[in-house]
Amino acid sequence: MLRIIMRSIFLLAIVLTVATSLCFAQAAPEEGGNEIQIWAGGGHSVAGGRGDTGAFNAGLRYGWILTDPHLPSILRGRFEYALDAVPVFLIFQPANTSYGVGFDPLGLKWNFVRRGRLSPYIELTGGVVFTNHEVPAFTNTVNFMDQAAFGTHILGEKYNWSLEVRYMHISNAGLANLNPGVNTVQVRLGIGKFFIRH
C-alpha cells in the first residue's frame, strides 16, 4: 500500500509540473483565471463523533475564478469553483489504519481581495471517500465529507503557498445502520499558482 501512495504522490508532482509549465503566472485570483495546487494536510478528531482518530490526506486541486470582485469593504472578493482529487487518504483509528481515495466535486471558495502578499479565503467543500476498512469501525467503507476552511494564499512571484485550518466531517449519511461520523480539525499546506490561459 505504501508503494501505491508513493506512486500517487509522484504522479501528482508530475501532473502539477506539466500543468504549471503550460500556464502563465499571475499574482492573485482574477476573473477568468484558474488555480492549480498540490496540497497535504492532517489533523485529529474533535468532539461530536468518534474520538481517538487522526487523518492525513494529500491531493490536487483545480479551480475556476468565476467573478470580478463583489461585496463591500473587508468582504470584497471573488467566487471560485474548485475540484479536488484526493489519491492519498489515511485515517488512523484505534481498530486499524484505513487507506483510501477521495474526490471533492463541490468546492465553493471565496477569495478575499489581496492584502499585500496575502490573499485570504474561506471555503466549503463536499465529496466522497472510499477506504479499505470501515470508517469508523463497524460502519461503512464509503463515506461522505463536508468541510469548511479558512486560510490564506501567500503570494509569490512564480508560485503561491497556502496555509489553512480545515474542519472535516466524515459520515456515511445513513448508508449503514451505524453512523457516528468522524470530525477532525486539520492544518493544510499547499503550493500552486493562479494563471490565465492565453
What do these predicted regions represent?
Residues 24-67, 179, 184-198:
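Short glycine/proline- and aromatic-enriched beta-strand/turn motifs that initiate or cap beta-hairpins
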Residues 32-34, 52-58, 97-104, 118, ...:
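Residues that define the transmembrane beta-barrel architecture of outer-membrane proteins
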Residues 25-33, 67-79, 113-119, 155-161, ...:
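Short loop/turn motifs that connect adjacent beta-strands in outer-membrane beta-barrel proteins
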Residues 34-40, 77-85, 120-126, 161-165, ...:
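Transmembrane beta-strands of outer-membrane beta-barrel proteins
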Residues 1-30, 196-198:
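Cleavable N-terminal export/targeting peptides
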Residues 43-49, 69, 86-94, 128-135, ...:
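Sequence/structural signature of outer-membrane beta-barrel proteins
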Residues 58-131:
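Gram-negative (and chloroplast) outer-membrane scaffold detector with strong preference
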Residues 38-42, 58-64, 105-110, 124-128, ...:
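Residues on the lipid-exposed face of transmembrane beta-strands in outer-membrane beta-barrel proteins
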